[in-house]
């Protein structure tokens, strides 16, 4: 029999064994990833695509040799009487909202036929592109109440010019009326105006009004109808500044927004008209001898400001920051550089270094400024929709360091209006810091007075 002592000993042994099992450490599962001894291998499967861009991101470099391949219409300038005939038909079509493809042709012919400002007689402002500039497309010159032109002989032209000069100095009303009748008859003959559809030619200044108005309408290629209507008062005032004559034609021009929408849609269907107009503009901006200051100012207003650097807001903002603050481009581009902006910043570097007219390169041409009107792939890395981060930061900095004036708020640029709040929250401090640094460089150097060292918020 088992004694009590043996039973107690056995129970004690079981207790010890159980305690040993409970106290035995359990295996812990590590939350850290298992690091193998094998070295990591770089994935090279996609290396062949490292330098590939497709679609809108493809960027093309401009060369002046490309001018010869630009498709343009074989359009011809017309004299004052025909400008008036076409101009009246143009305004009638817009007024009646009967816009069609011929209306677009009217605008082009009238724009290229615009006369020089501040002249006492009608002379075309623009020189046509040479045969080597552009690839000609067939174009039918529009006719408006005009029969076949009969023209004037050399003697008749001399008579017409002499009569115009006499009219300028004549004070006798009877003689002035006679001179005006002679001029009207000869201008009608020069333009080939028939008797059944004769167009009354009031003066050459009226021709200036139609040419000017047509050129402003071509701005609808790049601006909204709302913006055009809002700027009509300024258009009338600017015409009066360049042409010393009544602006009755412009005052009478009261287009409906519906008609302008139709015209803008008609323009969109004819991109070759824009190619033609901008090449005429670029040729005259670069011609030798150049335009007079007043003439270039007129061309700047009508076309250069609207069609230079199209869709390249980041680049024009960088130029504006440089001009307003004096910050060196080398410093400015360094500040703007990051992985998200690098393609656009590098493109800006190439534009400034290789294309722009500078102190070291005063003889360069400016055709590159209009290149994106001819092919949107030129300088594609600076297209606003392709470099929104750069546009946003440049716009924010520009707003903080320069006066906006008539150019409006750069933060209203369409490409950045709908940026998500998350990225804006990340970019705003960048712009704030950058603006402060630019202002420091703008206001402080070793010779600045002590007061300039006071820093203020750029907000």
From Swiss-Prot:
GO terms for cellular component: helical viral capsid; host cell cytoplasm; ribonucleoprotein complex; viral nucleocapsid. Coiled coil: none annotated. GO terms for molecular function: RNA binding. It is found in: Virion; Host cytoplasm. Keywords: Capsid protein, Helical capsid protein, Host cytoplasm, Phosphoprotein, Ribonucleoprotein, RNA-binding, Viral nucleoprotein, Virion. Changing residue 131 to T: In strain: Isolate 2. The keyword RNA-binding applies. It comes from the Viruses. Belongs to the cytorhabdovirus nucleocapsid protein family. Homomultimerizes to form the nucleocapsid. Binds to viral genomic RNA. Encapsidates the genome, protecting it from nucleases. If expressed without protein P it binds non-specifically RNA and therefore can bind it's own mRNA. Interaction with protein P abolishes any non-specific RNA binding, and prevents phosphorylation. The soluble N-P complex encapsidates specifically the genomic RNA, with protein N protecting the genome like a pearl necklace. The encapsidated genomic RNA is termed the nucleocapsid (NC) and serves as template for viral transcription and replication. Protein N binds protein P in the NC through a different interaction, and can be phosphorylated. This is Nucleoprotein. It comes from Lettuce necrotic yellows virus (isolate 318) (LNYV).
